[in-house]
Amino acid sequence: LMGVIYSTLAIAPVQFDREKVFRVKLQDEKQASILKNLTQTIELDFWYPDAIHDIAVNMTVDFRVTEKESQTIQSTLEQHKMDYEILINDLQEEIDKQFDVKEEIAGRHSYAKYNDWNKIVSWTEKMVEKHPEMVSRIKIGSTVEDNPLYVLKIGRKDGERKAIFMDCGIHAREWVSPAFCQWFVYQAAKSYGKNKIMTKLLDRMNFYVLPVFNVDGYIWSWTKDRMWRKNRSKNPNSTCIGTDLNRNFDVSWDSSPNTDNPCLSVYRGPAPESEKETKAVTNFIRSHLNSIKAYITFHSYSQMLLFPYGYTIKLPPNHQDLLKVARIATDVLSSRYETRYIYGPIASTIYKTSGSSLDWAYDLGIKHTFAFELRDKGKSGFLLPESRIKPTCKETMLSVKFIAKYILKHTS
């Protein structure tokens, strides 16, 4: 009997043998509509932009397709003389290649590797044990599947001070994002009293860090489907699972009719803040609004530093200020390994998005909100090899420290 029960529970992980990732450069309207038409009959998983309705002329589009459909795609692209390349020839091979750093000690958490959720949970406990005067863990809520949502507060325990809220892993498959949040907490706590800048920052401000926003989705991307993006909530009247948490915030939530299909990876959910994860974060930020002066969210991939707005091409009142911070922050980032980032408002730099955490935080009154799209530019996409984690974290750390110094000096 146990065998029967077990086999129904254990859905085998999705295999991606010989699936391909294409990159297509769209020259004109005709080519854009050819690509859009393909999606009527073939299921494409968009890597960049996030969804079919974001496609526009002169855009470079990355998407994943099954081995079976890749022939059709290729012949259509060639027939219409479209400019394309195959970024990834065998997705499963690329997935296996991510883990290119040897474990020092089997089963132990490592900053040089991707860590699954269980390792991250025990890591949060260890950080508090190791730095009790500097790190505390706050449970801000739980997920649909009843996993805890933990924020780590870093900073001196006494008194009210300015704060920065940071989150990672709102999209499950963007693994390098939670890796950065872990690195940040580790570096901040460990360098207090040793590194001059970090010590000054932590003496005068707090950091609230949510290492994994979309815990259920993250677990699912480890155990069942590496390409999963959304959370894992059930949708009424649909067999399709999950909401895109970064379309679920109460800011211009219903302005994009294209995000109301539960089967899409950018599904906005049945209502603004319908998701437990979103609600936990918004409640926490609202209750600390007096102190939170900046909000930073980490995604991958494409090497960009973005700021509001996403839902409109209108520029926010402090646009010049945000532009200046982003310009210097990307300069600082490139000083380490010459990694080039582009920067600008979401809507004009990439495409319009509605219901995002960034715009929500800004309209709530947090006047410095930024989204990092971490490495790379598409060679590995979401499957950045582990050997790139540390360089990515080190360069991003410089950038975040600059933003924090700026916030300390220039906000009231």
UniProtKB/Swiss-Prot annotation:
Q: Which reaction does it catalyse?
A: Release of a C-terminal amino acid, but little or no action with -Asp, -Glu, -Arg, -Lys or -Pro
One GO term in the molecular function aspect is: metallocarboxypeptidase activity
Among SMART domains, the record links this protein to: Zn_pept
Q: What is this protein called?
A: Mast cell carboxypeptidase A
Q: Which SUPFAM superfamilies match?
A: Protease propeptides/inhibitors, Zn-dependent exopeptidases
What EC numbers are recorded for this enzyme?
A: 3.4.17.1
Q: What is its main location?
A: cytoplasm
Family designation = Belongs to the peptidase M14 family.
* A GO term from the CC aspect: extracellular region
Propeptide positions in this record? 11-104
Q: Where is the Peptidase M14 domain?
A: 113-407
Task: Paste the cofactor note.
Answer: Binds 1 zinc ion per subunit.
Q: Where is the signal peptide?
A: 1-10
Q: In this UniProt entry, which cysteines form S-S bonds?
A: 168-181, 240-263
Do you know which InterPro entries this protein is assigned to?
M14A-like_propep, M14A_act_pep, Peptidase_M14
- Superkingdom classification of source: Eukaryota
The record's PANTHER family line, in alphabetical order, gives: MAST CELL CARBOXYPEPTIDASE A, PROTEASE FAMILY M14 CARBOXYPEPTIDASE A,B
**Organism (species):** Rattus norvegicus
